[in-house]
């Protein structure tokens, strides 16, 4: 596959739509549509920016999961605390801010921050980082945006396994929840 052209087709408040023109294996042109959170001016810009973080937080042997209303699918699903990096914000600062804003919890310690990975590679060049952290404090929604509807709670491995079987999850949260339920990580 050879990328021939990158063209912006829409500039939204948060998302920018692009058409990528490729030459496929048969020598024919293929138009591929993507969205990006960042301004892309040339092909080398694709997939270079880290845009956010997903946080797997634990406390006293339990995993933090958020039951959150997601506008794109018009329903609630289980997910991780997560958010976008603000301008000039470090990943560590983003973790602390998002954890507090979405749950009222404080960051006790960072266990591991993984290198950036693509979060929605079929439709976007967005890269995020997964962080495993230990949280402390009391869950509260008083710092949450009016545009977010989140119910945060900590769950035991057994409760997490039951939720995986009966509830709808984001894919990243589902994988982390399963690993947690099988003892693959803890604080």
Identify the residue ranges that each predicted region occupies:
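Short amphipathic beta-strand and strand-loop transition segments with alternating hydrophobic
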Residues: 1-11
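Nudix hydrolase/Nudix homology domain
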Residues: 6, 72-77, 83, 87, ...
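Acidic, metal-coordinating catalytic segment for phosphate/diphosphate chemistry
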Residues: 10-54
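Short, charged, solvent-exposed linker or helix-capping segments at domain edges/interfaces
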Residues: 28-33, 140-145, 164
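Conserved Nudix-box catalytic region and its N-terminal flanking loop in Nudix hydrolases
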Residues: 49-97
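Active-site segment of metal-dependent pyrophosphate-handling enzymes
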Residues: 58-60, 69-71, 77-79, 100, ...
């Amino acid at each position: 596959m050879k990328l021939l052209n990158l063209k912006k087709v829409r500039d939204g408040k948060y998302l920018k739509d692009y058409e990528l023109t490729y030459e496929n294996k048969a020598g024919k042109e293929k138009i591929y549509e993507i969205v990006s959170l960042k301004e892309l001016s040339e092909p080398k810009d694709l997939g270079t920016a880290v845009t956010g973080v997903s946080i797997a937080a634990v406390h006293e042997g339990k995993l933090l999961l958020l039951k959150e209303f997601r506008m794109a699918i018009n329903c609630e699903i289980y997910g991780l605390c997560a958010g976008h990096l603000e301008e000039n914000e470090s990943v560590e600062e983003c973790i602390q801010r998002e954890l507090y804003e979405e749950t009222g919890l404080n960051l006790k310690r960072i266990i591991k921050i993984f290198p950036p990975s693509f979060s929605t590679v079929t439709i976007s060049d967005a890269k995020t980082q997964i962080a495993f952290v230990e949280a402390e404090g009391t869950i509260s929604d008083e710092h949450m945006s009016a545009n977010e509807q989140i119910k945060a709670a900590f769950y035991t491995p057994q409760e997490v396994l039951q939720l995986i079987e009966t509830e709808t999850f984001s894919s990243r949260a589902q994988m982390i929840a399963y690993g947690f339920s099988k003892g693959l990580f803890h604080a």
